Amino acid sequence: MHAYRSHTCAELNAGHVGQEVRLSGWVHRVRDHGGVLFIDLRDHYGITQVIADADSPAFAELETVRAEWVIRIEGRVKGRDAALVNPKLATGEIEVYATGLTVLGAADELPMPVFGEVDYPEETRLTYRFLDLRREKLHANMMLRSNVVRSLRNRMWDAGFNEFQTPIITASSPEGARDFLVPSRLHPGKFYALPQAPQQFKQLIMVAGFDRYFQIAPCFRDEDPRADRSPTDFYQLDVEMSFVEQEDVFRAVQPVIRGIFEEFGGGRRVDADWPRIAYRDAMLWYGSDKPDLRNPIKMQVVSEHFRGSGFAIFAKLLENEGTEIRAIPAPTGGSRKFCDRMNAFAQSQGLPGMGYIFWRKGDDGAMEAAGPLAKNIGPERTEAIRQQLGLGEGDAAFFLGGKPETFEAVAGRARNEIGRELGLTEENCFRFAWIVDFPMYEKDDEGKVDFSHNPFSMPQGGMAALEGDPLKVLAYQYDLACNGYELISGGIRNHKPEIMFKAFELAGYPASEVEKRFGGMVKAFRYGAPPHGGCAAGIDRIVMLLADEANIREVIMFPMNQRAEDLLMGAPSEPTNEQLRELRLRVVPKD
């Protein structure tokens, strides 16, 4: 018999009755029923009930054990009476009568219990993450993650992709976030960077003649934390392909992602048809470039109904160039109480409020419009709005106006809130969409032209497109959205040096800077680069959706907290003076 166990704690059943066995695991729970001890013994695989009475040689020692002690049990398998069978346990037909006990590891008093799923403060959970991970839900999340990664690998291999590893220590490059810098001991004053993504390396793999690449890649970005984003590092399914156009990438990747959600989605519906939605349409209809399509609400432009109307705020607003009025339909939302609640929501998001109209049957049985806007614009305009939006009795619509970039994001959040409040957002399904035709450039906070997405993407129209207004240039860039989250981002790459130099020039990077920052890739492109493209899928977010978790930390083994601190390992930490001397660094105190 093995030194520690003959079976796991999920393995024994009625077929083992009468056998002598050895089990090892953690004491999950102890119950004393008047001279009979019941111990739930837990390991990675499951739970087995162990019993001992006063006649058992192990009884006295078993009375001393406490929760989360690690013990080894010798005993005999007994069948449970029919009335005592526990159908919730794989081992619920049997129990093990203990004849021997060895304590393998005692446990101090627990700062948080493992038994049960009681919520504890995040600080406690992350400080004692090894205990937190013993809890059933979190343990299941980590196993889900492991199985998802295994399935991703298998599916990529089956699709003809090859897995290659790229460097973890590399040069800094501008890819949309702050780098984590690593000082060089051998080259004082110089720094490496942890890669924000394997972007340049995977493109170089294509230039080197390998056709289909993938990697489960760690990525490092010094970012502000969000519920769906780690502040320091994350893992992605990194993909690149040679001799492809945009649709080729979609055809290769879509079956992999759909298969993962079908395999691990717990029966939730996965639509086979994934629409392509242009970025501008996504912002117009949904107020987001990662729309939640479970919500059927689609916003519309209704400017003409307010131009020259009696509602002076909107009418005057529309006199300014680049402004418009948008409506958010709210089917079944036609009550003043609901409209006031949504107006308060808009105010909580930083807006003065939202105008609204709701429709009801009047005393004469005819349809009538109510609400502040209805009184100002009159029945003809309100009826035209109702017909355009396809609304009827008991429905409402909310209105926002201005330059779209000033209110689109809030409109999108209001759309989501309305869908949730009215029960319109579909449950138990995954709704995907490819968002395409992203703008190549945007203006930053200082009004300067900068890349809006990935700087390595090919502009639609090539060099000719870059000769005009940069803010009108579209790129071969795309995202995959699912249920309001961005799961994939990618693009067809700019593999022509002359177009790359021009693209960077428009964003304020002279050729010398491009050569300095991306010299390796530019050099490679001068020796015959194939057209290529790819994408990266966020593994953490995929698992978060599959596990139905609201916070990404629930699917990461050892996550940082909101302040980018590892409370268990004490990171970040202060270096020793010796370490600083070796690196020829000194710490400059804050002002």
UniProtKB/Swiss-Prot annotation:
Q: Which InterPro entries does the entry link to?
A: Aa-tRNA-synt_II, aa-tRNA-synth_II, aa-tRNA-synth_II/BPL/LPL, Asp-tRNA-ligase_1, Asp-tRNA-ligase_1_N, Asp/Asn-tRNA-synth_IIb, GAD-like_sf, GAD_dom
Gene3D superfamilies referenced in this protein's UniProt entry, alphabetically: Bira Bifunctional Protein, Domain 2, GAD-like domain, Nucleic acid-binding proteins
Q: Which reaction does it catalyse?
A: tRNA(Asx) + L-aspartate + ATP = L-aspartyl-tRNA(Asx) + AMP + diphosphate
- Which GO terms of type biological process are on file? aspartyl-tRNA aminoacylation
Q: Which keywords does this chain's UniProt record carry?
A: Aminoacyl-tRNA synthetase, ATP-binding, Cytoplasm, Ligase, Nucleotide-binding, Protein biosynthesis
The UniProt similarity line reads: Belongs to the class-II aminoacyl-tRNA synthetase family. Type 1 subfamily.
Question: Which NCBIfam families would you find in this protein's record?
Answer: aspS_bact (TIGR00459), PRK00476.1 (NF001750)
This chain belongs to the protein called: Aspartate--tRNA(Asp/Asn) ligase
Annotated source species:
Cereibacter sphaeroides (strain ATCC 17025 / ATH 2.4.3)
Q: What is the lineage of its organism?
A: Bacteria, Pseudomonadati, Pseudomonadota, Alphaproteobacteria, Rhodobacterales
